Structures are given as C-alpha cells and as structure tokens.
C-alpha cells in the first residue's frame, strides 16, 4: 500500500489487489456502501503511517476509484471539528420550543444549524473531488485496459425498465436500481477482462436499442437518488412479469 499527500486535507491511498485479499476483501465489496468497507478503511488508516495533519482529524470522507490491478482511496478530513463552536448555535430555538419538538425534529434542527456553521466541511469534500479529477485525468504509462466498466441507463417508467432487463443476455457482475426526479436509473457493472477491445462499445450499442444512455454519474445517484435495489437489480427485475 502507498500513501500520497494530495493537499493539506486530502490523501490518496493506493491499495493493491493482494492487500485486499490479505484483509479478506475484494473489489465487489466496494460497489455498495456497507459497514464492512468502512471498517476496512479505518483498519488501513491504523496500519499506515498517516501524515501528522490527519492525526488530530475528526470526521473523514472516503471516495473509491477502482483500477484494473488496484484500488485508489481518496481520504479527506473534515474541518468541522476545528471550526464549530457551540456558542455559534445560539440561534437554535429556545428551550420552550425545543421541548415541544419530537426527537426527529430536534435532530433535524440541530443538523441544519451545524451544516450552516460548517461550510469548511463542504470545501473539504470539494477539494477531494478536485484532487480525484486531477489525479485520474493523467493516464499512467503502460496503463492496461480497465477490468470493469460501468454503464448507467435511464428509463421513464418501470415497464420500459423491466422490458430492457429481459434483453440482457450477457454476463453482469452486479447492478443497482435508483430513482431520481421521477426517472429510474439502472447501473450495470460488467467484467470486460479478456474481451475484445470493442466489446464495451458493442454492449453500449446493444443497450441503447432498449434504453437511454445518460451522463448522470453514480456518485450523483448515490447522493441525490433513492436506492431501490442494492445489488443484482437486473436479475431481480427479469423475474417480474409485465
């Protein structure tokens, strides 16, 4: 494993496949958020010699970029713990009003105030995204073809979505179903190792015959969409009669 300081608040950890195997992990574990992956990230942080700037950090954000033979993990520390002063929360409702709130209403009110007082935390996340974009925009020498490729398709209704899944006659590693802005989005992960170089383009052309290609990213769906089926969405929907 290797650690690279991207900025004061962002580092990149490169994890090789053999490192994953030693920790009982595999690429598929990172396709959907789960407690197992979060525990793995913090285990890695304990094992590595972290920069001093991260030793006193509070909240951390993780973003994963799969590569053919490794995993790049971008870690950004939150600045909210350094800049949030509870005296700044004086504009919370008074005690009488708080006493009338349900626990959920109180937590939402507190969360809103903390969010408004912690703009630096947003800056930290944006810095992570910028660092990732700059890092992945520079191709490595002798870089091999990616083993996995993601397709994201958009559907206006469930009927068209289900009809599409019944046309899928090629291997799919995993798939997810999201709903956002009254549209359905299907993410499909395909293993293209050992396939001809034109195989990804052929797949996309076949998909476009029954579905709408989109520039919407999986990160956007994860942040703003509703995850309806966590894994094997294609296989589950193929069983539905319409």
UniProtKB/Swiss-Prot annotation:
Homodimer. It holds the Pfam family MecA. Belongs to the MecA family. This is Adapter protein MecA. The N-terminal domain probably binds unfolded/aggregated proteins; the C-terminal domain interacts with ClpC. Enables the recognition and targeting of unfolded and aggregated proteins to the ClpC protease or to other proteins involved in proteolysis. It comes from Streptococcus gordonii (strain Challis / ATCC 35105 / BCRC 15272 / CH1 / DL1 / V288). InterPro entries: MecA_C_sf (IPR038471), Neg-reg_MecA (IPR008681). GO terms for molecular function: protein-macromolecule adaptor activity.
